[in-house]
Amino acid sequence: MEHQKTTPHATGSTRQNGAPAVSDRQSLTVGSEGPIVLHDTHLLETHQHFNRMNIPERRPHAKGSGAFGEFEVTEDVSKYTKALVFQPGTKTETLLRFSTVAGELGSPDTWRDVRGFALRFYTEEGNYDLVGNNTPIFFLRDPMKFTHFIRSQKRLPDSGLRDATMQWDFWTNNPESAHQVTYLMGPRGLPRTWREMNGYGSHTYLWVNAQGEKHWVKYHFISQQGVHNLSNDEATKIAGENADFHRQDLFESIAKGDHPKWDLYIQAIPYEEGKTYRFNPFDLTKTISQKDYPRIKVGTLTLNRNPENHFAQIESAAFSPSNTVPGIGLSPDRMLLGRAFAYHDAQLYRVGAHVNQLPVNRPKNAVHNYAFEGQMWYDHTGDRSTYVPNSNGDSWSDETGPVDDGWEADGTLTREAQALRADDDDFGQAGTLVREVFSDQERDDFVETVAGALKGVRQDVQARAFEYWKNVDATIGQRIEDEVKRHEGDGIPGVEAGGEARM
């Protein structure tokens, strides 16, 4: 998405109204020793703009950066979706923003944390946003808990400090978090660079083909650079030397022509099979076995262009899972449905009602709707009708009947957990990750990392954490408890001053 550059002014600067500015170095005063005057308009405008030049940082995912690129479809997946962006041979401009979840602007890139992987496709049918992470799962499956979760990873209201007790209190009171916390405390919680990590859509989405056939789909972006991670000591050292390590690595790699690539694969579950699969496919804390549904290659994502203006093209980029296109829909995943509202609403607050008019957020195709005016709205509506139906020749949409990207649902309005499937539980997949995926060395490092993160945690929460990990794996849980008790009072890796886990 091209950014409009400001033309250099050969004869000096101007005021905001375009008139010449007399000086950018000297204020207007009454004599050389006198006070400045209120009608020094250029001085006042300069400070007024400076006071308003920032927009609120994202509540989660505040620290990040990104780049533009291209997605090329190399395989034929038209049997799964009619979306033009995924038709054979299609090339689509993209924007990918990486981030950490918990850290604020200015926090180190190499803190242990989940990494955001927010991808926009500028398609012929509109912007398609896939707002994912570098993990295939998440801590929660109900959006009612989301705001509480984010607060538990932020700062205490009195001291303004982050607090390991608060983090573990939330996790252990919500056992569905176990799979993601295991992933986080494992080797992939500290990616060496953004280029050397995978990305995932995490949620389950609905794909619909030209014949109306439906599949539930999971996205996997597999790094062609391989997956490489940092040790606790390496991450701590880099955090103290260069808080922007990941941002710098990405920018400099692209600048010298080393363009990172990811291959996109999907898992496709036939619509009806989603109703009876042994895990609930709409539970964000679970993965879908690749033995049951192997990955299918779609194409390759390449990042090849750095932003020209970080604020205008990265900080002002407004992603939302609600931005879908024909052939791609949402699913009964509660977290996905909650995010579809919350993310767009957050962008309206953070950037403004005109958010979709900014160049980085504008779709490539023409927009025709009945949204008019509002704060900072600058589209000219002229004599267009502002209402429908109308008799003035302005078109509108009026389709009725079932929607392509819908699903069946019935029942009484209720507040309760999702129905359990045959193999559903909160600790099983986390245990499999520890026992069958981690190497012996990775298990040893995992025990050390978790024990370090539990250092200084209040004893009742610590005791609950020991049981939490024993539910994941009895042996690992006991090793964690033994390690914490053995090192009580000592400094151990993985803990910042004050007992804060490196998150």
From Swiss-Prot:
SUPFAM superfamilies per UniProt: Heme-dependent catalase-like
A Pfam family matched in the record: Catalase
Region Disordered, annotated ranges: 1-27
Reactions it catalyzes: 2 H2O2 = O2 + 2 H2O
Transport listed as a keyword: no
GO cellular component: cytoplasm
GO MF: catalase activity; heme binding; metal ion binding
Catalytic center residues: 61, 133
Principal subcellular localization: cytoplasm
Cofactor: heme; NADPH
Biased composition (Polar residues): 7-17
PANTHER family hit by this protein: CATALASE
Protein name as annotated: Catalase
Organism name: Micrococcus luteus
Gene (name only): katA
